[in-house]
């Protein structure tokens, strides 16, 4: 298969062998256009973003990305089923949210994951995209490994010992592309473990692991609960055992020094992603009331007046036992956003989990209890945006505040009695300040959910640079409407995960019966990875008189985008949906 070939469901990738001949001359790269072999480059390093302006306001965006990837041999050649147990923390009343207990399969493979915006776009690219375009369509994806180098490490007998590095022309790099998505899907952006965001800095793939079924019970408690919390292991249900190995499920290709590997092209089937936000809440839908009296002079204290008595107005409501028509009671066409139990932890047979909700800005974002919005909070290290000269292990963190404004303000919610009466007495209305179950500081908006068939939702925004780009559709009969981690959800199939592993490089002392650990020569690899991600975008047209806010720099943040005097760099998150649009 040559470069640019279509990668169908179940299609096999292309492997180009570029080993040197006895004379030292390399063979021609299959489709790559360059010669190969030891000491001869066989590929190109390209991190340019190309914008091709088409007809009718469309733009084709080709994002090229290249990285030098370093890979050590695995600690063990074995698959391991590992239980993570922190019952010492959850044994204390009120500590349910500290629960980390789970079981995972740790594999000897590593995952090359490019599924994050920062892998593909620099801040300048992102500025051009969000300032000039209104929507993105995800078109295609391809990736390649080339210029493979494998080296062995030995130590001299001198004191102190000296490490010696030698090229090993017969060692192998194992590469597997799961084009059928047979393996568990494990996007690494949720752990900030994708390829790094700086093209000039080497990066590493993440060790590949996946969840294994494990039942347990954790009974909720608070600090005043008497007795020790119930925390019980139940083990693995034999009906649910699924142990996957790459070696017997995915074709594995063996590359040696100078070899290349190409996946071919995957074409996406996804709905487009908007680069605009909506501001209309339910109070801004439809025709406003007619004003009988308009202001006669300028000034913020001069108001208009509806004029008609509230119980004599015309219109439609869903309020029984009253004739009052107000901006609060008139019937709106649908529910924009929804009140979500945004600090709700659900219980599952494998432990508690925070309920995911769709992000959407709530009010002025002044106080935590006004933000019923699910804005994602990212923690990341020096490969993914933290200042590269930072010392210590504490990650950097940002909260991405989505621009989609659902207008939620939980402090102002209330529930009326039936039949509706005005004014209401204390036993006719439930306010956020009313205690539930004798508790204070908890109101019904923590448990109240207005999601339903009348709910209007925006998809999640692109989060630059740390956010995930695409996600895999659930294999269920009923599909979720949005996925909260990524704006693009692949229908039917998504790009196959790319796995790599340094093959076992054995010594003459290997005895399969002697030990579970192989006697191996210390071997590592580095190789060049490159990819191409293609989008189509629609140029944004202006339909308003006023100019709008756009992404820019100023005197306060200009140095976020340039290195310090010792090379310190960081990447700050950027808004992706600055331009407003009406939704009705």
From Swiss-Prot:
Disulfide bonds join 490-494. It is found in: Virion; Host nucleus. It holds the Pfam family Parvo_coat. Keywords: Capsid protein, Clathrin-mediated endocytosis of virus by host, Cytoplasmic inwards viral transport, Disulfide bond, Host nucleus, Host-virus interaction, Magnesium, Metal-binding, Microtubular inwards viral transport, T=1 icosahedral capsid protein, Viral attachment to host adhesion receptor, Viral attachment to host cell, Viral attachment to host entry receptor, Viral penetration into host cytoplasm, Viral penetration into host nucleus, Viral penetration via permeabilization of host membrane, Virion, Virus endocytosis by host, Virus entry into host cell. InterPro entries: Capsid/spike_ssDNA_virus, Parvovirus_coat, VP1/VP2. One of its GO terms (cellular component) is host cell. Residues 1-41 are annotated as: Disordered. One of its GO terms (biological process) is symbiont entry into host cell via permeabilization of host membrane. Gene3D superfamilies: Parvovirus coat protein VP1/VP2. The capsids of autonomous parvoviruses expose a proportion of VP2 N-terminus and part of that sequence can be cleaved of to form VP3. Interacts with host TFRC. Capsid protein self-assembles to form an icosahedral capsid with a T=1 symmetry, about 22 nm in diameter, and consisting of 60 copies of two size variants of the capsid proteins, VP1 and VP2, which differ by the presence of an N-terminal extension in the minor protein VP1. The capsid encapsulates the genomic ssDNA. Capsid proteins are responsible for the attachment to host cell receptor TFRC. This attachment induces virion internalization predominantly through clathrin-endocytosis. This is Capsid protein VP2.
């Amino acid at each position: 298969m040559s470069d640019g070939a279509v990668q169908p469901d179940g299609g096999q990738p292309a492997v180009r062998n570029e080993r040197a001949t006895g004379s030292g001359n390399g063979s021609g790269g299959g489709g790559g256009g360059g010669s190969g072999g030891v000491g001869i480059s066989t590929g190109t390093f390209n991190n340019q973003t190309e914008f091709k302006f088409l007809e009718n306001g469309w733009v084709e965006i080709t994002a090229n990305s290249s990285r030098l990837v370093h890979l050590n041999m695995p600690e063990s050649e074995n698959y391991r089923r590992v239980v993570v147990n922190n019952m010492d923390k959850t044994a204390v009343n009120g500590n349910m949210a500290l629960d980390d207990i789970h079981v995972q399969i740790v594999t000897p493979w590593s995952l090359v994951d490019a599924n994050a915006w920062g892998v593909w776009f620099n801040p300048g690219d992102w500025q051009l995209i969000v300032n000039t375009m209104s929507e993105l369509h995800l078109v295609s994806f391809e990736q390649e490994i080339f210029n493979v180098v494998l080296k062995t490490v030995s130590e001299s007998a001198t004191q102190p010992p000296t490490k010696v590095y030698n090229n090993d022309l017969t060692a192998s790099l194992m590469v597997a592309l799961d084009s059928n998505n047979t393996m568990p899907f494990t996007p690494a952006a949720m752990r900030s473990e994708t390829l790094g965001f700086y093209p000039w800095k080497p990066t590493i793939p993440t060790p590949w692991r996946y969840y294994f079924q494990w039942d347990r019970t954790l009974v909720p408690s608070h600090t005043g609960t008497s007795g020790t919390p119930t925390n019980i292991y139940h083990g693995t249900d034999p009906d649910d055992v699924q142990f996957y190995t790459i070696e017997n499920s995915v074709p594995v290709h063996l590359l040696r020094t100078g070899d290349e590997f190409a996946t071919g092209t995957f074409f996406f089937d996804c709905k487009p992603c908007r680069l605009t936000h909506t501001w209309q809440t339910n109070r801004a839908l439809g025709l406003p009331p007619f004003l009988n009296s308009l202001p006669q002079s300028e000034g913020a204290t001069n108001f208009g007046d509806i004029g008609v008595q509230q119980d004599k107005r015309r219109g439609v409501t869903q309020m029984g036992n009253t004739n009052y028509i107000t901006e609060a009671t008139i019937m709106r066409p649908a529910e924009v956003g929804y009140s979500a139990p945004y600090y709700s932890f659900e219980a599952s047979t494998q432990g508690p989990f925070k309920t995911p909700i769709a992000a959407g800005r709530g009010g002025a974002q002044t106080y935590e209890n006004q933000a019923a919005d699910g804005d994602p909070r990212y923690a990341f290290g020096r490969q993914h945006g933290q200042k590269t000269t930072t010392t210590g292990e504490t990650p950097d963190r940002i909260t991405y505040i989505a621009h989609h404004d659902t207008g939620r303000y939980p402090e102002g919610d209330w529930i009326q009695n039936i039949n509706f009466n005005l004014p209401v007495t204390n036993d006719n209305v439930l306010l956020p300040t009313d205690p539930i179950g004798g508790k204070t500081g908890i109101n019904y908006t923590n448990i109240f959910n207005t999601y339903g068939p009348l709910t209007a939702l925006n998809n999640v925004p692109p989060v630059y640079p740390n956010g995930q780009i695409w996600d895999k559709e659930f294999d269920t009969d009923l599909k979720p409407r949005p996925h909260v981690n990524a704006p693009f959800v692949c229908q039917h199939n998504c790009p196959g995960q790319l796995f790599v592993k340094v093959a076992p490089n054995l010594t003459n002392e290997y005895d399969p019966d002697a030990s579970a650990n192989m006697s191996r020569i210390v071997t590592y690899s580095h190789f060049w990875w490159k990819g191409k991600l293609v989008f189509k975008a629609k140029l944004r047209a202006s339909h308003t008189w006023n100019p709008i806010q756009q992404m820019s720099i100023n005197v306060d943040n200009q140095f976020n985008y340039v290195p310090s005097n010792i090379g310190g760099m960081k990447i700050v998150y950027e808004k992706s949906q600055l331009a407003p649009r009406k939704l009705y």
